[in-house]
């Protein structure tokens, strides 16, 4: 940050973009958002186990509601989207954002995406950025193989990271979320990125971009529902979507 306040000009903030350069494009191996509280746990997951959503490329893809891979940092092997072949083929990321290094702005723009380009996985494949983060669909044997293989459709499963611990992403997220919640005294949300060296998977860097408390009151409920008497309950269920209060 360059502070110009002494001259009455305000502050100018500079934020480095995380990523690798691929010809005229620049993007990280992984962008992600994680929360220390998961309101939609699946199977043996618990709310306090947290939740993460990750994708290839710049984080704008996640912010814009793009298809991501969802997992709990404490249960990285339980990936619902990879539970069946049809589900994996349907619920996988097919596009991503990259910084267009050829698009040099001559003036400042209020459009934060003016120098971004939206690409397909074939572009990333040609640039060699999928090697450690995909599975490959074999149409002849009708199976999905862990890892990158020539030919076949590529599925962004991040299998080598979540299943085979090429990079300890799940454990790193779990520790950061736990410490962040402990220090802030409430559930937290983080934004992060991971860069992997395309030529050496043992060289990877984790970047913690932002951490902030979750302040949405609709998602924070201190009520002890076990104290509510059955005769005072209008409707109850053991399977619900998140927490909320309705005042009548």
Language-model segment annotations:
Residues 23-28, 64-68, 199-207, 220-223:
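Short acidic, glycine/serine/threonine-rich loops at helix termini
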Residues 2-13, 246-247:
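Single conserved hydrophobic/aromatic residue that forms the stacking wall/gate
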Residues 206-208, 212-244:
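Metal-dependent catalytic core segments for phosphate chemistry
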Residues 28-33, 69-73, 223-229:
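Short intrinsically disordered coil segments
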Residues 48-173, 177-183, 187, 194-195, ...:
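Conserved catalytic alpha/beta cores of large enzymes that bind or transform nucleotide phosphates
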Residues 16-21, 56-60, 162, 194-198, ...:
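Short, flexible loop/turn elements at secondary-structure junctions
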């Amino acid at each position: 940050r360059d502070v110009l306040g002494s001259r009455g000009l305000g502050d100018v903030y500079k934020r480095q973009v995380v990523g690798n350069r691929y010809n005229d494009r620049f993007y990280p191996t992984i962008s992600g958002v994680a929360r220390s509280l998961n309101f939609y746990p699946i199977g043996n997951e618990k709310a306090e186990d947290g939740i993460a959503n990750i994708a290839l490329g710049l984080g704008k893809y996640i912010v814009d509601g793009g298809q991501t891979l969802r997992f709990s940092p404490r249960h990285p092997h339980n990936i619902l989207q990879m539970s069946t072949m049809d589900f994996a083929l349907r619920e996988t990321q097919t596009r991503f954002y990259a910084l267009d290094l050829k698009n040099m702005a001559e003036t400042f723009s209020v459009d934060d995406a003016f120098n971004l380009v939206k690409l397909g996985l074939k572009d990333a494949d040609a640039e060699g950025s999928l090697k450690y983060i995909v599975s490959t669909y074999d149409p002849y044997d009708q199976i999905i193989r862990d890892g990158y293989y020539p030919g076949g459709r590529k599925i962004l499963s991040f299998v080598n990271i979540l299943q085979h611990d090429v990079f300890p992403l799940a454990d790193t997220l779990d520790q950061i979320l736990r410490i962040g919640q402990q220090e802030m005294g409430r559930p937290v949300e983080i934004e992060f990125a991971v860069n992997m060296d395309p030529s050496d998977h043992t060289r990877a860097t984790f970047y913690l971009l932002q951490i902030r408390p979750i302040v949405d009151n609709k998602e924070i409920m201190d009520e002890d529902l076990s104290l509510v008497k059955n005769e005072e309950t209008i409707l109850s269920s053991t399977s619900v979507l998140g927490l909320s209060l309705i005042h009548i």
